Structures are given as C-alpha cells and as structure tokens.
Amino acid sequence: MRMIDIIEKKRDGHTLTTEEINFFIDGYVKGDIPDYQASSLAMAIYFQDMNDDERAALTMAMVNSGDMIDLSDIKGVKVDKHSTGGVGDTTTLVLAPLVAAVDVPVAKMSGRGLGHTGGTIDKLEAIDGFHVEIDEATFVKLVNENKVAVVGQSGNLTPADKKLYALRDVTGTVNSIPLIASSIMSKKIAAGADAIVLDVKTGSGAFMKTLEDAEALAHAMVRIGNNVGRNTMAIISDMNQPLGRAIGNALELQEAIDTLKGQGPKDLTELVLTLGSQMVVLANKAETLEEARALLIEAINSGAALEKFKTFIKNQGGDETVIDHPERLPQAQYQIEYKAKKSGYVTELVSNDIGVASMMLGAGRLTKEDDIDLAVGIVLNKKIGDKVEEGESLLTIHSNRQDVDDVVKKLDSSITIADHVVSPTLIHKIITE
C-alpha cells in the first residue's frame, strides 16, 4: 500500500477503506509517513469529507494508536460527558456528584485549562489539599465505593490525535467536521467510556459559531459513538453569553456548590439537568429523560448531591468543610463594581471577550507553564435579557490588583445595552442519531 494512492483516492472523492485509514495513522505515528503527505490527506478530507464508516474507522485508528484506559473493574455503565468548551462552563463540577448521587458511576479524566479559565482540575485545586494524582487501583476503588472520582490525564492516550491536531493547526485544516469529530471521540473512547454525552456549544463564544455547523458536528460525533458500540447522545447549547454568572476558578467552584444546593443560576441548573438526564438514561438508571430529570431534582432537594460532593472532595484529600464555609476558598483582595453607563436591557455579553478579561486578571493560562490565580475572575450581576439602570452594577471584578483599567477597557467593548429585550435560547436541540 502506498500513501500517495490513498491521498489521490480521497482527493478524487472516493471512500477510504478501514485498512487504508489504519495504514495512514499507523505510519504517521511511527514517523514513516512525513508531515507533507499527512497534511495533503488532511486537506483532501477537508474538501471531500468522509462518510460515517470512514469517520468511525479514523476514530478507532486513533484510539488504537496508544493506550486505552481499562475501567472494566468499575461496576455499571461508565458515562462520560464532553463539552466543546465555553466560558464559565462549570457543568462538570455539578454533574459529576449529581449523577453519582443517583448511582451513575463517574470515572472522570480531566485536564488543566488553557485560555479563558482553568480546566476542571484547576477549579478543584482551589480546594485546599485536593489532588488528582491517584493511581489506577485507587481510582477504580473510589468510583466503586463513592461513584465518583477525578484523575489527571496520564498515559499515552491517542498519540495520533496529538500529532494530527498539531499538524492541522498549522495547515488550515482545523475546521473539518470529520477531523474534529474523530479527534474528540477518540479521546473519550480511549479514556474508557461505555457511553458518551456531548455538549456541543454554538454562538459567539463557541468553536462552532453557527447552529448549522454545531448540528453537523453533533450528528457526526453521535454517529461515530453509536457505530463503534458506545451509546452517544448530544445537546446543542448556546454560548452567546457565558454560562452561569461566574468566570474564574474559585468563583466557579462556589457557583457549583450553590447549584448543588438548588440555589444556582437558572441557565447552569437547566443545562446540568438536561445533560444529567441523558447520562442517567444511558447508564440504564431510568427509562425516560423525564424520569431521569425527576431523580436528579430529588437528589438536589434531598441534599444527596451536595453530600456526594463532600465525600468526593474528602476522598481526594480536599478540605470538604469549604462546602459549608465557602469563605475558606481563595478570595481576591479587591472587588470592583463595573457599572452600566446607561439604562436599558442587556442585549450582548461577548463570551470570548469576558473570558479574555478574566484571563487578564490571572484566571487563565496563555501557555502551559503559566501559574493561575485561583481567586480572581468576574461575576456577572446581569445577563442577556435583564433590565439595568444607569449606574447599576453589571458585573463584579474580583482582582488581586487595584488597577484594572486594561480589564475595564476590554469589558467596555463586550457589553451592549439597548432599549429592546432579547430572549436568549439555552438549549437549541437534542441529538440522538
């Protein structure tokens, strides 16, 4: 088999066989196939697309290029959730203990954040003593006993994806549905998930700006999952404004605690219940989404979800008293109110810009080596659709420096107040095929 034949076949719009896809991935990881041929094939895929079988084959070739995490010693259906990323996305912190409280095992592998705010691990490390460096045996034991544990990413998972992603990044082939879908799904499958729930974001703060693109990606990933024996569902949710009210690590953790108490922001609570219901159904703990939702609401109202979060924190060395004493979380030195310059209704909160403003305060990383300030960030006091009076606080800046003129300047261009009301949509669609 020759790589040039595979490139020409895809260039001319033909379907690649599983053997041809395996030959490419295997050769590329070993270094037998050079970058210039790999980038040529990526560009051919970009223009000619791939059918469902090709996408499934590409995903599994990337899974098989490295280690797979074996979670077979964990009892029950392991359901993993993936979000395509957004600003103030606190869902994992709420979802993990919430679905664990209704007996769904959550064996979560999470990373650190690059960009706007920290990843799930950074947020959890705002709790004194919390650590994710646990060995596989302890990880399995914790999930079997308490239904939830979080571990840092380790091992040689999907090396083909890492190599191909770096190449796509510099060759103009990032925005290709088959390449994005196989990249995301290969990581989830390699991490040992039996079933997968996907939160595909759309809007100004999302990777997929249009609903049409988000739908195409959601369908692609759901079909890949179902074609390779992993039951998969997706929802398309809105990222035209940050989710919830908090952007920043300790601030988002506080918001997660409030949500588990039943006192969280409406949009975050709704998204968590929608995603959680799918996880419960896929784990065979409820027949219908309605039944699953009722179980989750009961777990919040009874305090079971919050109790589960406490045990989870304690199991991983953290100080679980922060749940009842949130003032023990890292606190910023200054709280600065950002006030409305006129009266009206909030019509725009540009997610990316608000995320960048939070990063300027120190809440996110520009490079992997950067330190994160866990205490700082932004709390939105108004969301899209809310009425605001001139001089009223739109948001609160939590900062460890007094001079935040650069942050204020960034925020000036990211908030729009007009005289008409805009009603945001949170969940656009649920995709099951």
UniProtKB/Swiss-Prot annotation:
Any one Gene Ontology biological process term?
A: pyrimidine nucleoside metabolic process
Single GO MF annotation: thymidine phosphorylase activity
SUPFAM superfamilies on file = Nucleoside phosphorylase/phosphoribosyltransferase catalytic domain (SSF52418), Nucleoside phosphorylase/phosphoribosyltransferase N-terminal domain (SSF47648), Pyrimidine nucleoside phosphorylase C-terminal domain (SSF54680)
Enzyme Commission numbers on file: 2.4.2.2
What's one Pfam family here? Glycos_transf_3
Superkingdom of the organism of origin: Bacteria
Enzyme class label: transferase
Q: Which residues bind substrate?
A: 168, 187
Q: Which GO terms describe its cellular component?
A: cytosol
| Record key words, sorted | Glycosyltransferase, Metal-binding, Potassium, Transferase
What reaction gets catalysed by this protein? uridine + phosphate = alpha-D-ribose 1-phosphate + uracil; thymidine + phosphate = 2-deoxy-alpha-D-ribose 1-phosphate + thymine; 2'-deoxyuridine + phosphate = 2-deoxy-alpha-D-ribose 1-phosphate + uracil
Instruction: Please indicate if the UniProt record lists Transferase as a keyword.
Output: yes
Keyword Glycosyltransferase listed? The answer is yes
Cite the InterPro entries for this sequence.
Answer: Glycosyl_Trfase_fam3, Glycosyl_Trfase_fam3_N_dom, Glycosyl_Trfase_fam3_N_dom_sf, Nuc_phospho_transferase, PYNP-like_C_sf, PYNP_C, Pyrmidine_PPas_bac/euk, Pyrmidine_PPase_CS
Intrachain disulfide bonds: none
Where do the annotations place phosphate binding? Answer: 81-83, 92, 108-110, 120
Comment on bound cofactor: Binds 1 K(+) ion per subunit.
* Residues the entry annotates as binding K(+): 88, 90, 243, 246, 255
Q: Which cofactor does it need?
A: K(+)
* Protein task: Catalyzes phosphorolysis of the pyrimidine nucleosides uridine, thymidine and 2'-deoxyuridine with the formation of the corresponding pyrimidine base and ribose-1-phosphate.
Its subunit composition reads: Homodimer.
Family assignment? Belongs to the thymidine/pyrimidine-nucleoside phosphorylase family.
Q: Which NCBIfam families match?
A: PRK05820.1, PRK06078.1, Y_phosphoryl
**What protein name does the entry list?**
Pyrimidine-nucleoside phosphorylase
Originating species? Staphylococcus aureus (strain N315)
Q: Which gene encodes it?
A: pdp
